[in-house]
């Protein structure tokens, strides 16, 4: 993990963490609270999942569960955890097999194959549950294999408790009043939230989920376009009792906000960042939050979504451009 001051990093793992916080200024009309984004899009492989890729592999090594050059790592993922594991596996010498719903962006497939990870696509109608089942099926017939289990692995929230939470506290000079985070595995809000609550019991925690798959709000799982959150079940690592409120955001809202963040803030981020921002802005408009500071997690960089609906219009424009004489 990244230290405060570093000359030349000994390897890529020392580049993880210590991502910046930045205020949102031009998409916050009507807000009575300030909103600052934690740019996890600036991790070495462009997402918050770089943290848990490091944490889960390191934890398993320390427990003697896996060994480079011998163990085969397996993980079901919507993509970013796969990438976080893929660069770690490449750096440490592991074979990695990823199972992923075929509905996830093409960029994810290309990046995973770029790290020479083996990729098995699963039925998108079965969501993450289908990817999990396929991972278990592969493990049963693969010697020396180990599933890292991001949805159940305590090393997931642990790294956020040890790094993300402290970074938010220090970066805000201890003035953070609330944290808003999309819920995929639940590791980010659980680990970061627990740390922030220990520093200030009054810190509010807001989870974000798709309105189309509002499990935490008592709804049913359903298809949506916010890749990375709304897995359709309540993950084992998520401590639901920590959360003060769950804010629902639609796929359309999330996509539009992600576009606005690029156009008005100069922040090229993914759809789940748009969802988190939309939710944080809703919270920042509530009268009881006047004068407060809300930190929102932006999980990933927009370039990973070029083939998705987020960039559909500009992609078509780019494809149809002609050469000027």
Curated annotation (Swiss-Prot):
GO terms for cellular component: cytoplasm. Pyridoxal 5'-phosphate binds at residues 80, 184-188, 272. PROSITE patterns: CYS_SYNTHASE. InterPro entries: Cys_synth, Cys_Synth/Cystath_Beta-Synth, CysK, P-phosphate_BS, TrpB-like_PALP, TrpB-like_PALP_sf. The modification N6-(pyridoxal phosphate)lysine is found at residue 49. The keyword Transferase applies. One of its GO terms (biological process) is cysteine biosynthetic process from serine. It is found in: Cytoplasm. SUPFAM superfamilies: Tryptophan synthase beta subunit-like PLP-dependent enzymes (SSF53686). Pathway: Amino-acid biosynthesis; L-cysteine biosynthesis; L-cysteine from L-serine: step 2/2. One of its GO terms (molecular function) is cysteine synthase activity. It comes from the Eukaryota. Its cofactor is pyridoxal 5'-phosphate. Homodimer. Belongs to the cysteine synthase/cystathionine beta-synthase family. This is Cysteine synthase. It comes from Solanum tuberosum (Potato).
């Amino acid at each position: 993990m990244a230290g405060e001051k570093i000359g030349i990093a000994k390897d890529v793992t020392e580049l993880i963490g210590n991502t910046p916080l930045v205020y949102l200024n031009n998409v916050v009309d009507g807000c009575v609270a300030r909103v600052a984004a934690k740019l996890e899009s600036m991790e070495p492989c462009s997402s918050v999942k770089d943290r848990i890729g490091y944490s889960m592999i390191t934890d398993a090594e320390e427990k003697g569960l896996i060994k480079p050059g011998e163990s085969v790592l397996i993980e079901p993922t919507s993509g970013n955890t796969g990438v976080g594991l893929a660069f770690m596996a490449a750096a440490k010498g592991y074979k990695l097999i990823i199972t992923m719903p075929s509905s996830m962006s093409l960029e994810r497939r290309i990046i995973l194959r770029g790290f020479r990870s083996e990729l098995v696509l699963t039925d998108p109608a079965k969501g993450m549950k289908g990817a999990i089942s396929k991972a278990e099926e592969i493990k049963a017939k693969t010697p020396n294999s180990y599933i890292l289990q991001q949805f159940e692995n305590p090393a997931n929230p642990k790294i956020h408790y040890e790094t993300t939470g402290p970074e938010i506290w220090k970066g805000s000079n201890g003035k953070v009043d609330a944290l808003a985070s999309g819920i995929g595995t639940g590791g980010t809000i659980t680990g970061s939230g627990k740390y922030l609550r220990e520093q200030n019991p009054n810190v509010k925690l807001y989870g974000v989920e798709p309105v189309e798959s509002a499990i935490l709000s008592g709804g049913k799982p359903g298809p949506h376009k916010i890749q990375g959150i709304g897995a359709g079940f309540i993950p084992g690592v998520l401590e639901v009792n920590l959360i003060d409120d769950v804010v629902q955001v639609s796929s359309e809202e999330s996509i539009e906000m992600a576009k606005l963040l690029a156009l008005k803030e100069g922040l090229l981020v993914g759809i789940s960042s748009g969802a988190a921002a939309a939710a944080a802005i809703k919270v920042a408009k509530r009268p009881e939050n006047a004068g407060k500071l809300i930190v929102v997690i932006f999980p990933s960089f927009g370039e990973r979504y070029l083939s998705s609906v987020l960039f559909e219009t500009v992609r078509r424009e780019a494809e149809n451009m002609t050469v000027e004489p």
